A protein has these predicted regions:
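Compact, glycine-rich, soluble single-domain proteins
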Residues: 3-84, 92, 96-98
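Well-ordered alpha/beta subsegment
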Residues: 80-81, 88-107, 112-115
């Protein structure tokens, strides 16, 4: 899980993510993400802005700063709606938000019959 490195209420809103992490998982500036805060159960959506590469920064801005504060552990997820297969990308990070492992994603389709 990533660690929040900064939390600022007096800002329009967003989450700043180390650009190296963004590149590793294919996040684009302005992309919508879900943020799940492991320390208090809060969940919110916001958009991504890049933080300096190699900084390890995960900063929460705006009203979401009420939900996630410095030191909180978070899971950040992005989704896409498409009729094409998209290979999910997942990484694990250490306490400094540096990638320690790329996780494989194995999905299995479950057929559903409609009457």
């Amino acid at each position: 899980m990533a660690r929040v490195t900064d939390s600022r209420l007096d800002y329009i809103g967003s989450i700043a993510i180390d650009e190296d992490l963004m590149d590793a998982i294919g996040l684009e500036p302005g992309e919508m993400v879900h943020v799940w805060v492991m320390d208090n159960g809060e969940r919110f959506q916001t958009y991504v802005i890049p933080a300096p590469p190699g900084s390890g920064e995960i900063a929460i801005y705006g009203s979401a700063a009420h939900k996630a504060q410095k030191g909180h552990r978070v899971i950040i997820a992005s989704t896409v709606f498409t009729d094409e297969w998209v290979e999910p990308k997942m990484v694990l990070v250490n306490e400094k938000n540096q990638i320690v492992q790329h996780l494989p994603f194995k999905a299995q389709a479950v057929p559903v019959e409609l009457s």
